[in-house]
Design a protein with these regions (language model features):
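C-terminal catalytic core of Y-nucleophile DNA break-rejoin enzymes
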Residues: 73-93, 103-125
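Basic, Lys/Arg- and aromatic-enriched nucleic-acid-binding interface segment
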Residues: 2, 12-41
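Catalytic-site neighborhood detector that most strongly recognizes the C-terminal catalytic loop/helix
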Residues: 69, 73, 166-190
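DNA breakage-rejoining catalytic core of tyrosine-based enzymes
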Residues: 1-16, 76-85, 101
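Conserved tyrosine-mediated DNA breakage-rejoining catalytic core shared by Y-recombinases
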Residues: 50-88
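N-terminal core-binding DNA-recognition domain of tyrosine site-specific recombinases/integrases
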Residues: 26-29, 79, 112-118, 133-139
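C-terminal catalytic core of tyrosine-transesterase DNA break-rejoin enzymes
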Residues: 36, 40, 143-168, 176, ...
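Alpha-helix N-cap/helix-start motif at helix boundaries, enriched for small hydrophobics
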Residues: 34, 46-51, 162
Length: 190
């Protein structure tokens, strides 16, 4: 991703709007999972396209609290444990109830796995149709990382924890993802 033109993160109002819009789509359950894998788990388009049911289910077929993202599904060798929000886990449970838990979690309308390119295109079309200029498949990841950075200190964490959540090899890369908040700067100064 170019450092001069980053994908815009989504604010809370935009996130609610997307979730409402997705609820009215043909594949609402699947689409909700794809969106939440982006904004809650911070997955890249390639990772969303390739995450498999076996990465989120235990031996008995129950959902776990984390995605065990394999290196082959991640950028570079950045696989690892990706923790799930309650709303993502709930959305996955809804999808599991209407899906066969084999191979990839999200599939195209024809039942085939998404490619990284088709997943990227799905997000681009979603944001274009909603009029969200500057948003792309990476907007959800930037949204997640910015949220983590703003709230990690409330949980006795640090930016190194955010770096680990983002699965970045350097703290500098993680810092580039974090959106500046003028409101937060004003409040901290008093």
């Amino acid at each position: 991703m170019s450092l001069t033109k980053q994908a815009k993160p989504l604010n809370e109002k935009q996130q609610r709007f997307v979730l409402s819009h997705i609820g009215d789509t043909r594949d609402a359950i699947r689409n909700r999972v794809m969106f939440l894998l982006s904004i809650d788990a911070g997955l890249r388009a390639k990772e969303i396209a390739s995450v498999e049911w076996r990465m989120v289910l235990d031996a008995e077929g129950n959902l776990t609290d984390a995605i065990r993202l394999e290196n082959k599904s991640a950028k570079g060798s950045s696989g690892g444990v990706v923790y799930m929000s309650e709303r993502l886990k709930s959305a996955l449970a809804d999808l599991l109830a209407v899906s066969k838990p084999i191979s990839t979690i999200v599939k195209t309308k024809s039942g085939k796995p998404f490619s990284a390119a088709s997943m990227t295109n799905w997000f681009w079309l979603l944001y274009r149709d909603l009029g969200f200029e500057g948003c792309s498949s990476h907007s959800g990841r930037r949204t997640a990382i910015t949220k983590w950075a703003r709230t990690i200190s409330q949980h006795n964490g640090s930016m190194r924890d955010v770096q680990a959540l983002a699965r970045h090899s350097s703290l500098q890369m993680t810092q580039r993802y974090v959106e500046v908040s003028e409101d937060a700067m004003k409040r901290v100064v008093g």
